[in-house]
Curated annotation (Swiss-Prot):
GO terms for molecular function: calcium ion binding; calcium ion binding involved in regulation of presynaptic cytosolic calcium ion concentration. CDD domains: EFh_HEF_CR. Its main location: other. It comes from Homo sapiens. Residues 16-51, 63-98, 107-142, 151-186, 195-230, 235-270 form the EF-hand domain. Ca(2+) 2 binds at residues 76, 78, 80, 82, 87. The modification Phosphotyrosine is found at residue 214. Keywords: Calcium, Cell projection, Metal-binding, Phosphoprotein, Repeat, Synapse. One of its GO terms (cellular component) is stereocilium. InterPro entries: CALB2 (IPR029646), Calbindin_Ca-bind (IPR051001), EF-hand-dom_pair (IPR011992), EF_Hand_1_Ca_BS (IPR018247), EF_hand_dom (IPR002048). The lineage of its organism: Eukaryota, Metazoa, Chordata, Craniata, Vertebrata. Ca(2+) 1 binds at residues 29, 31, 33, 35, 40. It comes from the Eukaryota. The keyword Repeat applies. This is Calretinin.
């Protein structure tokens, strides 16, 4: 874990590049689990306070515990005591805050799924490096943010290094969805009840009564209700409507095909 005796990189800078931000993240996420938590979180705040005071950026409150509590109340949206990478980007002075750029233009689950549908061009269940580059380029244009080819390449590689949890050079849907605010990330709701390929095939076949290879939104409603009841999880009408809308963003002309739903509900995307 990062200790006070080991100076973390770049915290004193007035503005961070995307690459520098990533180095800070890796420094404090010592166990590499995708969160800064526990002692890691305490170390981060101690070092951030030191760096800001050293560079003349005094905090409003000198009370470490109070400041840390305020931060967690503001950014720890699901109150799990952990800080995610995209949340950290909101307090560090990151150049052209590229993570927030995602959130401004892919702010809801439905918009995110529409973007995923566009850039997962081969419908593999992954966005690969060349597809991600196009995704980022379009987002930067939407945000009217100037960029050049080297900067676009840096953003692409940084996002890959941030969210490519298994190091295969491509992003699965669940990995990419970490760009969404926690409260908008409907995919988190399916954690702990992912299906195997065999389980998915059985449930899809049950609801695809006419064996057409796709289901409509009403059949999806029934499928989601069944899935939640099976896993003893509660879901109200509004949640069901939101989840259905998000998943149906993957559909073509109201038809949700087996392969697209499998990306959302299975442990691994289809090969």
């Amino acid at each position: 874990m990062a200790g006070p005796q080991q100076q973390p990189p770049y915290l004193h800078l007035a503005e961070l590049t995307a690459s520098q931000f990533l180095e800070i993240w890796k420094h404090f996420d010592a166990d590499g689990n995708g969160y800064i938590e526990g002692k890691e979180l305490e170390n981060f705040f101690q070092e951030l306070e030191k760096a800001r005071k050293g560079s003349g950026m005094m905090s409003k409150s000198d009370n470490f515990g109070e400041k840390m509590k305020e931060f967690m109340q503001k950014y720890d949206k699901n109150s799990d005591g952990k800080i995610e990478m995209a949340e950290l980007a909101q307090i560090l002075p990151t150049e052209e805050n590229f993570l927030l750029c995602f959130r401004q233009h892919v702010g809801s689950s439905a918009e995110f799924m529409e973007a995923w549908r566009k850039y997962d061009t081969d419908r593999s269940g992954y966005i690969e490096a060349n597809e991600l580059k196009g995704f980022l380029s379009d987002l930067l244009k939407k945000a009217n943010r100037p960029y050049d080819e080297p900067k676009l390449q840096e953003y692409t590689q940084t996002i890959l290094r941030m969210f490519d949890l298994n190091g295969d050079g491509k992003l699965g849907l669940s990995e990419m969805s970490r760009l969404l605010p926690v409260q908008e990330n409907f995919l988190l709701k399916f954690q702990g009840m992912k299906l195997t390929s065999e389980e998915f095939n059985a449930i899809f076949t049950f609801y695809d009564k006419d064996r057409s290879g796709y289901i409509d939104e009403h059949e999806l409603d029934a499928l989601l209700k069944d899935l939640y009841e099976k896993n003893k999880k509660e879901m109200n009408i509004q949640q069901l409507t939101n989840y259905r809308k998000s998943v149906m963003s993957l559909a073509e002309a109201g038809k949700l095909y087996r392969k697209d739903l499998e990306i959302v509900l299975c442990s691994e995307p289809p090969m």
